[in-house]
């Protein structure tokens, strides 16, 4: 369990799924009795794996396959992402995002507009690895530890464990042993662990100081702890991360059912499911999957083998469709909250895993995004916009807010001399009544408004707001970002005359 003796570290699940699988995969999951925590108090229904797979009719076998495929997908993606990362940096070494425009890491990892991220995959099969976190000073930093299923099992840093330097031994499942003095143990649920550290920055001028802090993070095998170690700093020249993510996903989705479930079975050996997954594990066993053993659909009759392949294809298709579905919005903003710790929501976990996971707990960073104005029209640089916060509706957070505008296809550079980021660190000027207006437009506003200006890229764009260490009002939805207002022609003319 995450440590809670220093500061707030709640991991409450707030389920508000914005995208759901289409039938038939959704039917498979509902039949599998995937009761979502907080959404129902009814006891789980009987698992669909009540009889062995070879005794099923083809339709039931296809349904069973879809359920298990979706359940396995995040573990398969973590494995594929690790293999992609190992082509660029050794296991147990950090891959650093060195600037706000650097795309050396997957999109979900670098989605925060005001942080530099460092990513490392750990293989704990040979024993614990010590993570050395430096003194953070006044800078806000957090380190998320993900298991192989993409759930965050611990968070270190400013919000949870404080700013002091610390040494943490990340131990594999079932490990028992002694640790050096001053080293605290964090038990990992799986042997494959993903570490993502985020260092908050106030803009490009602050990047050099943030990079120096990144260079002070260390990962050391326990057996080597205390010995001299080479400097762990690797600068990666963009682009590449999106390609690596796409390649990882394609590697997984290109597998036929036999190859997919054989790899899944191999990963299960060192990356055990969560204790709460007992119902789903009955489905896994009923399909004929045994940890560490090859999967062979041909042991079924021809119709059964075809049903398994069709079930895998249907699950892939349903995941791809679910990712593309328009999200449910409020005031035009999509705010995912049930991420980072998924409980029994295997569907949501798989949908997030499609884009590479790497998301934070909402308690660390709440990210809202919008691509439309208050009238539902797409945001476009041919217009000017205002984001207005009433005095009592300013973004509720403990460690800052940031606003970014990005192109609809990839990060687009801001106009010359400006950055595509506006944050609380810029000290935007409030109105006389205490309210705040932020100007989203391509061309600079009058001089008196430029401290409140977020430059936008040419063409259609998306606005992304990050609340770091959000307050409860943001987490429980009693606060929502206001809709983006398009300035009328008269207002634009008034601005030009100022």
Where in the sequence are the language-model features?
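Bacterial N-terminal signal peptides that target proteins for export
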Residues: 13-28
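C-terminal motif of bacterial Sec signal peptides marking the signal peptidase cleavage site
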Residues: 36-38
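Intrinsic low-complexity/disordered segments
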Residues: 10-12, 490-494
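A compositional/structural signature for long, glycine/proline-rich flexible linkers
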Residues: 40-490, 497-498
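Short, Lys/Arg-enriched N-terminal segments with co-localized hydrophobic residues
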Residues: 1-10
């Amino acid at each position: 369990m995450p440590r809670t003796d220093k500061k707030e570290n709640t991991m409450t699940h707030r389920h508000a799924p914005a995208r759901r699988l289409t039938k038939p995969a959704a039917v498979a999951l509902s039949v599998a009795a995937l009761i979502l925590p907080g959404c129902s108090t009814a006891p789980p229904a009987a698992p669909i794996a009540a009889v062995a797979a070879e005794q099923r009719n083809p339709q039931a076998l296809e349904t069973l396959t879809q359920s298990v495929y979706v359940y396995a997908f995040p573990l398969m993606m973590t494995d594929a992402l690790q293999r992609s990362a190992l082509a660029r940096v050794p296991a147990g070494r950090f891959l650093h995002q060195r600037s706000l425009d650097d795309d050396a890491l997957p999109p979900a990892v670098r989605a925060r507009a005001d942080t530099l991220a460092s990513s490392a995959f750990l293989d704990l099969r040979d024993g614990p690895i010590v993570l050395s976190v430096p003194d953070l000073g006044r800078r806000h930093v957090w380190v998320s530890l993900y298991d192989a299923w993409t759930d965050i099992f611990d968070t270190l840093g400013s919000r949870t464990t404080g700013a002091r330097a610390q040494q943490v031994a990340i131990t594999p499942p079932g490990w028992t042993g002694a640790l050096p003095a001053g080293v605290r143990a964090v038990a990992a649920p799986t042997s494959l662990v993903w570490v993502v550290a985020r260092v908050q920055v106030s803009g490009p001028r602050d990047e050099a100081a943030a990079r120096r802090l990144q260079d002070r993070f260390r990962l050391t095998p326990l057996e080597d702890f205390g010995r001299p170690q080479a400097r762990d700093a690797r600068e990666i020249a963009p682009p590449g991360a999106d390609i690596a993510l796409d390649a990882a996903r394609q590697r997984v989705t290109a597998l036929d059912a036999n190859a997919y479930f054989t790899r899944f079975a191999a990963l299960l050996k060192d990356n055990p499911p969560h204790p709460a997954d007992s119902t789903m594990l009955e489905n896994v066993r009923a399909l004929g999957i045994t940890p560490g053993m090859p999967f062979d659909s041909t042991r079924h009759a021809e119709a059964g083998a075809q049903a398994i392949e069709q079930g895998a294809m249907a699950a892939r298709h349903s995941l791809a469709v679910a990712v593309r579905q328009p999200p449910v919005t409020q005031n035009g903003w999509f705010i995912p909250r049930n991420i980072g710790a998924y409980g029994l929501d295997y569907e949501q976990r798989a949908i997030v895993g499609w884009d590479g996971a790497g998301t934070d707990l909402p308690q660390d960073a709440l990210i809202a995004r919008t691509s439309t104005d208050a009238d539902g029209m797409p945001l476009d640089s041919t217009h000017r916009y205002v984001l207005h916060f009433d005095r009592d509706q300013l973004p509720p957070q403990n460690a800052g807010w940031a606003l970014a505008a990005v192109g609809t296809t990839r990060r687009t550079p801001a106009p010359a001399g400006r950055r595509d980021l506006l944050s609380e660190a810029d000290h935007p000027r409030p109105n006389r009544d205490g309210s705040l207006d932020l100007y989203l437009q391509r061309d600079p506003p009058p001089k008196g408004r430029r401290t409140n200006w977020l430059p936008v890229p040419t063409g259609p764009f998306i606005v992304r707001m990050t609340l770091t260490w959000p307050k409860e009002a943001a987490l429980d939805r009693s606060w929502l970002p206001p809709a983006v207002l398009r300035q009328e022609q008269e207002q634009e003319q008034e601005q030009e005359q100022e």
